[in-house]
């Protein structure tokens, strides 16, 4: 059955005509938008709210020591091999369940700490995924493994588990935005699919469309409103970037991707800016773009402090 178009709609965040309010009057006026009081129905926090308020986003970090030196650049490409380890470690019936879902409720990736040490981060987006995926890996019996492709053996030397309530999304959304500028680091190769083609560039519409789609699919199976997707392209500006192409091997295929950093500046009303901040918070767990479960699309977000306005001396 096709997913319903629902969730947060563009008209929930802003509407046409009228005079904008608040400290961003000029930017809102440029697009003819005005403030709407944030009493909207937030996807997953309306009639489904009681259940969703108990969900958590979790991140398990394993420090792994390896028995042979690894090039730092190579570590970020280990995702598919680590994904294989993950699938062999979790219950077989849950692996079958994962084959039936449109968006995987987890992401994972690895980053180098040194030539003989790496961090493997596994994030889950639901309580069930935490129990089925993180549970077995966080068990003391999971002490290490051997990567089949390279023969390199690993040993778990430390592990830590972070849990955040999904309701934090709503808290960020309803709060007044602290900033409208965000620096996003793309830690592992990132790419998007558009009209059957790979796009390996931090296009604002594709970045935030991806995050909104992942959020909607996980929370209640709904696609983001088309008008809202269009708003991502109109009201989020790529104000700085430093990226490089970085292909990602998945089996015999090579997926074109990019790594680096991009700075996004949000225009429009406060509600929209808060929504962008909430999506970025979620994205640090879900990953951004395609194949986040295979190790692509890992992001780290840094809110940038707004510039202080110079007040002329009397």
Swiss-Prot record:
Ca(2+) and Mn(2+) stimulate processing of pre-crRNA. Keywords: Antiviral defense, Endonuclease, Hydrolase, Nuclease, RNA-binding. The keyword Nuclease applies. Disruption phenotype: Deletion of this gene alone blocks maturation of pre-crRNA. Deletion of the entire CRISPR-Cas locus (cas6 to cas2, Rv2824c to Rv2816c) decreases resistance to plasmids encoding spacer elements about 6-fold. Disulfide bonds: none annotated. It comes from the Bacteria. Its cofactor is a divalent metal cation. CRISPR (clustered regularly interspaced short palindromic repeat) is an adaptive immune system that provides protection against mobile genetic elements (viruses, transposable elements and conjugative plasmids). CRISPR clusters contain sequences complementary to antecedent mobile elements (spacers) and target invading nucleic acids. CRISPR clusters are transcribed and processed into CRISPR RNA (crRNA). Processes pre-crRNA into individual crRNA units; accurate cleavage of pre-crRNA depends on a 3' stem-loop and the sequence of the bases in the stem. The mature crRNA is unusual for type III-A systems as it does not undergo 3' processing after Cas6 cleavage. Mature crRNA is about 71 nucleotides (nt long) with an 8 nt 5' handle and 28 nt repeat with a 10 nt stem-loop at the 3' end. Encoded in a type III-A CRISPR locus. This is CRISPR-associated endoribonuclease Cas6. The lineage of its organism: Bacteria, Bacillati, Actinomycetota, Actinomycetes, Mycobacteriales.
């Amino acid at each position: 059955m096709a997913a319903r178009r629902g969730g947060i709609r563009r008209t929930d965040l802003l509407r046409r005509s009228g005079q904008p309010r608040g400290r961003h009057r000029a930017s809102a006026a440029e697009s003819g938008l005005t403030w709407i009081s944030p009493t909207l129905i937030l996807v997953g926090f309306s009639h489904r709210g009681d259940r969703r308020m108990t969900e958590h986003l979790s991140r398990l970090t394993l420090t792994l020591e390896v028995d042979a030196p690894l090039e730092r650049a190579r570590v970020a490409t280990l995702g598919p091999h680590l994904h294989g380890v993950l699938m062999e470690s979790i219950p077989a019936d849950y692996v079958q369940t994962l084959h039936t879902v449109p968006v995987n409720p987890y992401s994972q990736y690895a980053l180098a700490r040194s030539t003989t040490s790496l961090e493997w981060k596994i994030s889950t987006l639901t309580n069930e995924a935490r129990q089925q995926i993180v549970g077995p890996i966080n068990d003391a019996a999971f002490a290490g493994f051997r990567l089949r492709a390279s023969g390199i053996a690993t040993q778990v030397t430390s592990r830590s588990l972070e849990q955040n309530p999904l309701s934090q999304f709503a808290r960020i959304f309803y709060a007044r935005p602290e900033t409208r500028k965000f620096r996003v680091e793309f830690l592992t190769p990132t790419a998007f699919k558009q009209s059957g083609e790979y796009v390996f560039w931090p296009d604002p519409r594709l970045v935030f469309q991806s995050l909104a789609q992942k959020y909607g699919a996980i929370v209640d199976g709904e696609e983001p409103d088309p008008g809202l997707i269009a708003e991502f392209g109109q009201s989020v500006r790529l104000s700085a970037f430093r990226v490089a192409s970085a292909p990602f091997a998945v089996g015999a295929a090579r997926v074109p991707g990019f790594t680096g950093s991009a700075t996004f500046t949000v225009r429009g009303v406060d509600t929209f800016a808060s929504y962008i901040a909430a999506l970025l918070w979620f994205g640090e767990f879900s990953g951004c773009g395609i194949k986040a479960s295979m190790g692509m699309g890992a992001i780290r977000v840094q809110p940038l402090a707004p510039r202080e306005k110079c007040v002329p001396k009397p």
